Design a protein with these regions (language model features):
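Conserved alpha-helical scaffold segments that buttress catalytic/binding sites
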Residues: 1-207
Length: 207
């Protein structure tokens, strides 16, 4: 799909599905001669453990695999983090060149100010992959996920941030992961939010 050169949207699945997608994005970018590529990762969790439960391909290891052979740590940016493993905090201490925007930053500074940080970081990039874990959204708005964390973004914030990214940065591929209908409420609120995000994504592409 990426070899077509068209925007690609993938739906998971837990966050481990992003590992091969990032690698395909890296290979495609290299074949196209794109020099500057990056990843924007929206999530409650950093997913940058080397191993998790003795497993290196876990959903908690997605970005560790990515910085091994797709991008450098400085080409990775997070938004929405508010739950960490000790190993992940140690990684961030060792690699301050990455951009980390916490969920509290969005609450304190506003989503637009936080978007501006992403825009400043990636405005000169050739291609960016955007991965969106639905648990970045507070479980009041998106309870249907495997590892919900209180204190996340609102549904409006995630929609506006998605539109800003797709409308202004060179997003070449995207995924939405960790939506779990069996864990959702009877009104399917999480699935409806994921569907609304998809609507907004393709609305941006059509402009």
């Amino acid at each position: 799909l990426m070899k077509t050169g068209k925007f690609s949207l993938f739906l998971g699945g837990d966050h481990s599905v992003t590992i091969p997608l990032h690698r395909a994005f890296g290979r495609y970018s290299k074949e196209k001669g794109l020099k500057k590529i990056g990843v924007i990762h929206f999530d409650s969790h950093a997913d940058i453990c080397d191993t998790y439960d003795s497993h290196k391909w876990s959903h908690a290891c997605t970005e560790r695999r990515t910085v091994e052979d797709v991008i450098t740590p400085g080409d990775l940016a997070y938004l929405g983090l508010h739950s960490y493993e000790i190993e992940e905090l140690e990684y961030f201490d060792a690699h301050p060149e990455g951009l980390v925007i916490k969920a509290y930053d969005v609450f304190r500074d506003g989503y637009l100010a936080c978007y501006k940080k992403l825009e400043e970081r990636f405005k000169d990039y050739d291609a960016v992959y955007f991965t969106l874990d639905i648990d970045v959204v507070d479980p009041a708005f998106a309870p249907g996920t495997g590892t919900p964390e209180a204190g996340g973004l609102t549904s409006r914030e995630i929609l506006e941030l998605t539109k800003l990214l797709l409308g202004n940065l060179p997003i070449k591929a995207m995924d939405i992961v960790e939506v779990s209908p069996p864990l959702d409420q009877e009104n399917d609120i999480t699935s409806w939010l994921a569907l609304k995000i998809i609507y907004e994504v393709f609305g941006c592409l059509d402009r």
